[in-house]
């Protein structure tokens, strides 16, 4: 039987009374690609393991802690979840993920494309279909503004290789901030090869200390968005994409609420072949860095994450067969009638939620 969703926009007090936490409840996996902030955000040691690093990432961003984590270069990811299903509300934005993107004041192309520091991350979502509370079900990508564009490549694999102990650094004499231009080698499934340089601003090991000698990531990769506007390597602008990515637009645009900055719709979900799918809700989110680009003294494009939360934590699902004797749709929670469709519906302050015509 086809399912429908009804929405109760109750007060935040309602949400907490029910024990629902709108913020990240748990980080299940933290697997960054190499990068200049890796092993420092959060701090890692050689004694760490995937489990201890997931716990450190959890301590940083779960439960509204808002301590930044870095995903490193292309493919680096984090998997987190919520203590409830985030419902797919038709026509609404369902959840928000915060990064540290900002617009540049001296942006030469501000009139045609906004930019500054944009390090976009792709979002994937999953339901708890097997009801085991773990993110081990099918993943769906949220198809942002670049998903169907020719420059975007899907099923792309990139592998990074740990730098050998006997490696000899290759500095760049023209750009002294680049102390090693052949630091971490990488290769791709399309035959590309290159290096992630090391800079003088971040001198720790860029390769995740708790990983093996190589790491591979597979996913969607987007076109580079960084431009050396100075042509001398002194001023880079990374331009924003239109919508659908983490750490791409600023977290808040108070003068432009229509932009829905850093907000996401579950309705954007597509399957592995790019076909739209309908999900009535999701419980798990995966974010990974979407671009492989090195922007001079700014370093690699690396998605950062600060926080994430449900935009309508008081929403409750409704099935079509929940009817009263007069054919009106009803929903209960803990034995209390919350919404009655087919009649006017009000919240606890008397404000109308749904008007029956």
Regions found by a protein language model. Name each.
Residues 1-20, 316-319, 350, 354-357:
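Bacterial Sec-dependent N-terminal signal peptides
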Residues 18-121, 143-315:
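A domain-level signal for the mature, folded cores of soluble proteins
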Residues 122-124, 344:
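Beta-strand signatures of extracellular beta-sandwich domains
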Residues 126-132:
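Short loop/turn segments immediately following beta-strands, especially the blade-tip
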Residues 133-142:
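Tryptophan-centered short beta-strand motifs
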Residues 142-143, 356:
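Short hydrophobic alpha-helix segments
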Residues 312-342, 352-353:
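Residue-level detector of functionally pivotal "anchor" positions at catalytic/ligand-binding pockets or at interdomain
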